Amino acid sequence: MSRYLGPRFKIIRRLKTLPGLTSKRPKYKKRVRRRFSRPWWKKSQHLICLQEKQKIRFHYGLTERQLRQYINIAKRAQGSTGQVLLQLLEMRLDNIIFQLGIARTIPAARQIVNHRHVLVNGRVVDIPSYRCKPQDVLTIKTKNPEELRTIINKNRSKFRRKVPYHLTLDLAQNKGIVNKIIDRKDIQLKIQEMLVIEYYC
């Protein structure tokens, strides 16, 4: 299955807030609720698991095949499979660029990486799925450092986005540092990761 390139509001209305997919917010129409009305259908367990799986896919911009690969890696690792899965996804290079505030969304961060604007420990890395490790130093290649600082400050203030505790942003030198692997409590995406694992069992 290829990466989703269709309308993003359609996904947001169905799965609710996914900050990695889009920074915009759709307008919801107010529905008039009748006094004795009841929902005519109930969500099955399979549907709930499917929606949680789709949240991860669309938030991080993964294909079905990529997500399966991450789940297989998480199953072989020590610890909670769901927590390891989220940590693997959060430590992707495109997600780190997004979390630092350099890009508005993860697709925008992926484009920055693909265009070879990112250096990891002094080397150009153009693979968005590159797994960052503790003590990695990320630098952005730019001809106008002042403009980059303005973009970062604008993204952080407009979307009220704080740099997570596992990262450090040095605006003076236009670089970010990965301090450690992210903790589960610091992950911003509202997700029930064990339902995703259950979906693939």
Swiss-Prot record:
Alphabetical keyword list: Chloroplast, Plastid, Ribonucleoprotein, Ribosomal protein, RNA-binding, rRNA-binding
Residue ranges constituting the S4 RNA-binding domain according to the UniProt record: 91-151
Gene3D superfamilies: Ribosomal Protein S4 Delta 41, Chain A, domain 1, RNA-binding S4 domain
UniProt xrefs under CDD domains: S4 (cd00165)
Keyword Ribonucleoprotein: yes
SUPFAM superfamilies: Alpha-L RNA-binding motif (SSF55174)
Compartment list: Plastid, Chloroplast
InterPro entries for this protein: Ribosomal_uS4, Ribosomal_uS4_bac-type, Ribosomal_uS4_N, S4_RNA-bd, S4_RNA-bd_sf
Top-level division of the source organism's lineage: Eukaryota
A molecular function GO annotation: structural constituent of ribosome
Pfam families associated with the record: Ribosomal_S4, S4
Any one Gene Ontology cellular component term annotated for this protein: small ribosomal subunit
Transmembrane listed as a keyword: no
GO biological process: ribosomal small subunit biogenesis; translation
Broad class of where this protein is predominantly found: plastid
Purpose of the protein: One of the primary rRNA binding proteins, it binds directly to 16S rRNA where it nucleates assembly of the body of the 30S subunit. With S5 and S12 plays an important role in translational accuracy.
Oligomeric and partner information: Part of the 30S ribosomal subunit. Contacts protein S5. The interaction surface between S4 and S5 is involved in control of translational fidelity.
The protein, known as: Small ribosomal subunit protein uS4c
Protein's organism: Welwitschia mirabilis
